[in-house]
Regions:
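RecB-family 4Fe-4S metal-dependent nuclease core
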Residues: 1-35
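Structured loop/turn residues at beta-strand edges in well-structured enzyme cores
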Residues: 17, 68, 124, 179-180, ...
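Conserved P-loop
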Residues: 36-131, 135-140
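Short, well-ordered beta-strand core segments
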Residues: 73-75, 184, 226-228
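P-loop NTPase motor core
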Residues: 133-217
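Conserved GTP-binding G-domain of TRAFAC-class P-loop NTPases and closely related GTPase folds
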Residues: 178, 191-273
C-alpha cells in the first residue's frame, strides 16, 4: 500500500532565543524586505553623484598629476611613480618574505584584491579611487592565474586559460567600479604600435590604451568617459574624440571634444551634460 504524506502549507511563527542569530529576523518580525523596488519616479540625469573615468596617454603627459587633483584621493599604484603627487597610496607589487630557507611570495594581484575588499567596507574617508596603471594590473592577474592553473602561458591550456584570466580580471575590476565612491579613475599608457587600414586603403597608426582589445572594450563599457591625454605645443589636452583611429568617447553627451587638462574645466564637462 502506497503511503502519501501531506506536506504542511502553513508555517506558523515560533519565536525563540535562536531568532537573534537569524538573518531573516527583521523580515519575520517587522516585515522588512531587503529587495524592495525603487520608487516609480524618473531620476534627474543632471544630478551626477559618481564619476567613472578611464584616462590614457603617453608617459609624462600629466595623467597622474591630473588625477591627483580630485578630492580625497587614494592611489592604487603599480609602477612606483608617486614622487610628485601627494595622494596616499597603496603599492601594488609582489611581497616576498623569507622564513629560514623558505621564500614566500604574495602576488601583486592578491594585494589589489585585498585593497578592493577593504574599500568595499567603506570604513574610510576617501572620495576618489585611482588605479595607476591598469595594464600592469592585467599582467599581475595573468601571473597570479598562471600560478593557480600551473601553467606558464595561456596557450598551455588554450581551451580555458584565456577565459579564466579575462574573467578573473574583469570581475574584480567590475567590483572596483561598483564601489560607492564619488570618483573612480583608471589610468593607462598609450599604445601606438599597431597600424589600421582605413576604408580608403590608407594605413594609419591606431591610438588606444595599452591593453588587450577585448578587455579594453569591456572596460570602456564600465566607465562614463574614455579620454586621451596628450601634449600639443606645450599645452596639455584632455580629448574625448572617438573615431576609427582614436579610442575614446563615452556615454555622456559631451558638448566639447577637447578641453585643457584642468580639474575645474573637467568638472564643468559634467555640469554641462
Amino acid at each position: 500500500m502506497e503511503i502519501t504524506k501531506t506536506l504542511p502549507k502553513d508555517f506558523p511563527r515560533n519565536p525563540n532565543k535562536f531568532c537573534d542569530f537569524c538573518g531573516y529576523k527583521n523580515y519575520c518580525y517587522k516585515g522588512d524586505d531587503l529587495m524592495i523596488l525603487p520608487e516609480n519616479k524618473r531620476r534627474d540625469l543632471n544630478e551626477v553623484t559618481k564619476k567613472t573615468i578611464w584616462l590614457y596617454g603617453k608617459p609624462f603627459s600629466g595623467k597622474t598629476t591630473f588625477a591627483n587633483k580630485f578630492p580625497e584621493p587614494l592611489m592604487l599604484n603599480t609602477d612606483g611613480n608617486i614622487k610628485f603627487v601627494d595622494a596616499p597610496y597603496i603599492p601594488i607589487k609582489d611581497e616576498v618574505s623569507v622564513t629560514g630557507r623558505l621564500t614566500h611570495r604574495k602576488f601583486a594581484w592578491q594585494i589589489f584584491k585585498e585593497a578592493v575588499d577593504e574599500l568595499e567596507k567603506k570604513e574610510n574617508s576617501f572620495k576618489t579611487i585611482i588605479v595607476d596603471l591598469l595594464e600592469d594590473l592585467y599582467e599581475y592577474c595573468r601571473l597570479y592565474m598562471y600560478d593557480q592553473l600551473g601553467i606558464t602561458h595561456e596557450s598551455d591550456d588554450s581551451f580555458r586559460a584565456w577565459d579564466k584570466v579575462r574573467i578573473e580580471f574583469l570581475s574584480t575590476i567590475k567590483r572596483l567600479m561598483n564601489l560607492d565612491y564619488e570618483n573612480i579613475i583608471l589610468i593607462s599608457h598609450e599604445d601606438t604600435s599597431k597600424d589600421i587600414t582605413r576604408k580608403s586603403g590608407d594605413k594609419v597608426t591606431a591610438i588606444k590604451p595599452n591593453l588587450n582589445d577585448k578587455v579594453a572594450n569591456k572596460i570602456a563599457g564600465m566607465v562614463d568617459i574614455v579620454a586621451r591625454v596628450y601634449v600639443d605645443e606645450k599645452q596639455r589636452v584632455l580629448s574625448f574624440k572617438s573615431d576609427e583611429v582614436v579610442f575614446g568617447g563615452g556615454r555622456l553627451k559631451l558638448r566639447a571634444k577637447e578641453i585643457n587638462l584642468d580639474y575645474e574645466k573637467f568638472e564643468e564637462v559634467y555640469k554641462c551634460i
